[in-house]
């Protein structure tokens, strides 16, 4: 059964609020990126709210939490609350989708922007205790050689905020963990969250999203049960058919027919029939 928080209990570390705050407050989103990445950003734009990228027919699409651009960089910010062993593969897939979305037909590869895939996790995905894991492609034979493909993946482990030396990052990670603002920026985040909660239209939006998700969950559960029943029936038929072939082969063996002819008659392999004679 799916569980949804009450609207009044939502925090910045819940997906609805996380996306709402960063989508509707461009200055806050830009400041967050600058704090996490330690870079200066001129401005950001939102290519599409709740961007879904699916470049090929029947390919797996991806819905990005927060997808923004500046003049020569693209950023995907993902909030991850639940344990997930697939984060490394998800970063690879998200990266490929960003590239497909940002290189038009006829453009040169040199026009690809620098991309950042950022995961903010409420757990340590690699169990090494680091507050930040940064990945870039390097040469195994010469670690000093960076591939320079302008692809950077940063995974933040909020549970290790106490050992993060950068005070801005530490304060943000702590806020993700316990929702207690400890600096001006997290105070601003907390204030925006409370303002969002005061508007009834946001509450209705959140509730309608939950109804949609709950319907999808129930539909998927029903389809899964039906598929399981169908597979069980097919498996039973298959097993029954196999057993019938074996019984037929046993009867034919008592009639002194050749193993080759029995194999042709039943569809069993010669090896299977030889096993019945032992």
Region locations from a protein language model:
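Conserved single-residue anchors adjacent to enzymatic active/cofactor-binding motifs
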Residues: 1-204
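Short, charged alpha-helical interaction segments and adjacent helix-coil junctions
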Residues: 1-6, 71-80, 166-278
């Amino acid at each position: 059964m799916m569980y949804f928080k009450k609207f009044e209990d939502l925090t910045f570390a819940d997906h609805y609020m996380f996306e709402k705050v960063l989508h509707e407050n461009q200055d806050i989103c830009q400041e967050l990126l600058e704090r996490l990445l330690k870079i200066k950003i001129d401005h950001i734009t939102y290519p599409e709210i709740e961007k879904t990228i699916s470049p090929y027919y029947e390919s797996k699409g991806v819905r990005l939490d927060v997808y923004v651009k500046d003049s020569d960089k693209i950023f995907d910010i993902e909030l991850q609350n639940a344990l997930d062993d697939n984060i490394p593969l998800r970063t690879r897939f998200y990266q490929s989708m960003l590239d497909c979305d940002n290189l038009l037909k006829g453009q040169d590869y040199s026009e690809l922007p620098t991309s950042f895939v950022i995961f903010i996790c409420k757990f340590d995905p690699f169990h090494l205790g680091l507050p930040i894991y940064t990945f870039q492609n390097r040469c195994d034979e010469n670690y000093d050689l960076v591939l320079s493909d302008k692809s950077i993946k940063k995974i933040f482990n909020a549970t290790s905020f106490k050992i993060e030396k950068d005070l801005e990052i530490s304060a943000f990670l702590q806020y993700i963990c316990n929702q207690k603002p400890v600096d001006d920026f997290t105070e601003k985040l907390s204030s925006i969250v409370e303002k969002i909660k005061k508007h009834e239209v946001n509450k209705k939006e959140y509730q309608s999203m939950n109804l949609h998700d709950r319907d999808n969950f129930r539909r998927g559960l029903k389809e899964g049960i039906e598929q399981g029943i169908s597979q069980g029936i097919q498996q039973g038929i298959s097993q029954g058919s196999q057993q019938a072939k074996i019984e037929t082969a046993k009867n034919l063996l008592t009639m002194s027919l050749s193993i080759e002819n029995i194999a042709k008659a039943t569809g069993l392999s010669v090896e299977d029939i030889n096993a019945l004679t032992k």
